[in-house]
Amino acid sequence: MQRKHKRILFVAVSFIALGCVSAFVLFELSKSISFFCTPTELVADPIKSSRYPIRVGGMIVKGSIVRHGDSVTFSITDLGTELEVTYRGVLPPMFGEDVGAIAKGRFVDGVFIAEELLAKHDEKYMPKKYSSSDAAVIGSS
């Protein structure tokens, strides 16, 4: 083979290999995509949850937490719409009423089935080991 043909073949094989690697990386990354929406957005467009798991966030509604053995059912709200969530697993330590929560899962027949659950805290969070006087000192620095 002539030098010119070898160079063309090398470039062509390189582009094909690069394309295959790029396609593989994009395919693998698409598995980890999870979109975020509010309960109002999810109820308005339930198709969002059909292809990929999504994250939905809001405040846990007072009086909505019901435990069933190792699973829990509760409602979250964005102050517009309430969404029923079912979760099976270990609850986060800060989980409770009037606490922000983010659930990752799928929306099936009007109920959000969560695979992961995170409890949020506000930016003023202080660990219990600090007293209120320590918090004042830390907050002023």
Swiss-Prot record:
Enumerate the residues binding heme.
Answer: H121, Y125
State the UniProt keywords alphabetically. Cell inner membrane, Cell membrane, Cytochrome c-type biogenesis, Heme, Iron, Membrane, Metal-binding, Signal-anchor, Transmembrane, Transmembrane helix
Chief subcellular location: membrane
Q: Entry's Gene3D superfamilies?
A: Nucleic acid-binding proteins
UniProt record, GO biological process: cytochrome complex assembly
> Which family does the entry's similarity section mention?
Belongs to the CcmE/CycJ family.
Q: Know the name of this protein?
A: Cytochrome c-type biogenesis protein CcmE
Upper taxonomic classification of the species?
Answer: Bacteria, Pseudomonadati, Pseudomonadota, Alphaproteobacteria, Rickettsiales
Provide the gene name from the record.
ccmE
